[in-house]
Structure formats: C-alpha cells, structure tokens
Amino acid sequence: LDDLEKLNRRRFSSHQMSESKDSPLFAQEIKASYEKEPNLVDGREILNKSFAEFLTDPRVFILGEDVGKIGDVNQTLAGLQEVFGPLKVTDTGIREVSIVGQGIGASMRGLRPIVEIQYLDYIFYPFPILSDDWACLHYRTAGGQKAPMILRTRGHRLEGIWHSGSPMAVLINGLRGVHFCVPRDMTQAAGMYRTLLAGDDPGVVVECLNGYRLKEPMPTNLLEIQVELGVPEILREGNDLT
C-alpha cells in the first residue's frame, strides 16, 4: 500500500506546472532601463516593436481575428503581416474555438503560437477546450506532453456593456495549470511575453484596454526585459500601505 500511495501521489499530485529547467518560474528579472530623457510613445508601439522581435523566431506565429491586415484592433501588430507574411501573422474568422484549437495543436508539436482572443469577454466561447484540453494537459500526462501556447487578450476597461469585462476569478480558478499575467502597462506586458516564450508552460496575458494609447517611456533594453512570475512588483513602499 505504501508503494501504491507513492505511485499515486506522483501520478495525481504533480506536474500541474512544468517541473523542467525551462519553467518560466525560473526566469530571472531583467528590469527596464531608460535614458535620462526617454522618448515617450504610445503603449501600442512598445508591443509592436516587441512582437516584431518575437516573430523572428521561426517557431513563433500569431493567430487571431484582425491581427494581420489591419494590425489588430489596437494597432499593436500594425505592419507586421507585411513584413513577416500571412503564415506568421494570420487572420482568422470569428471562431474562438478554432483559434484556440489550432494554437493548442501547434504548441504540442513544438511551435510557439500566440493566439488572440480579441476581448476578454469572448474567452468563454472556447472555455471547455481551454479547461479540458489545454490547462490540464501537462498534469494529465504526468509531464509527458506540453502545450506552451500563449493566449493573448485584453479587458478590464469596466466602462460599458460590451468588451469591458474582467472575470478574472472565474479564469484563475477554472484554468489551473496556466500562468495568468495581468500587466499594468505595455512595457510590463512585453516582459511577460518574453518570459513566457522562454519557458515551456502555457500562459494567458490580459492587457489593459485603456493602455494602448497612454504614453510610456521607451526602454533602451526593450528587447531584453523579462518579468519574474509570481513575484509582486512593489511600486511604493510605506509603513501603513504598500
């Protein structure tokens, strides 16, 4: 019975996340650095430059609604289909289930897809697939299979009936086995994408809808920034409130 208990513990109490040396939890933080008087740009420009660098990796492609011809609805991918071609930046129909399914399959075969769900509200259309076929794949196979797809979306605007939701509690509790990254600005988002792409776990990045045209200083080391996952960022420390 002791041997069976040890075996079952290994079978059913391990591998929710990657346990390899490539786990994104091992990523070291590389902070943004700036010139004394940095150039201020729209947040979307920071992501555009970052995605252009990611796409130079032959394994990386971006798939989703309006990501190609119009450069996505917030212009973070503007011009990238022209540079890299429609196989690297691919427009799809309005079929979230198909988008996610293609991404999961590609990631299981060694590619590194970044699939876009245009708004966070729409993540519930493919939710059964995300929950049953993606988030728990590593756990169900005791680490034998991986699907390190990155699901990119945006939300939190909280300013209207549509395209404004922030159902994070449902997602965090419903998609065990996935890293959830919620950046406060697009520089931090770029670092989170880089950390996830360097690792071998699945991840969701929820960008802030109101951040694409807010001005941010352009880092001098934008293409090197990494965010350490699971470690809170301290913006201002105090005696009563931090």
Predicted segments with their positions:
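Short, flexible, solvent-exposed loop/turn segments with mixed acidic/basic and small polar residues
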Residues: 169-170, 232-234
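Aromatic-enriched
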Residues: 211-233
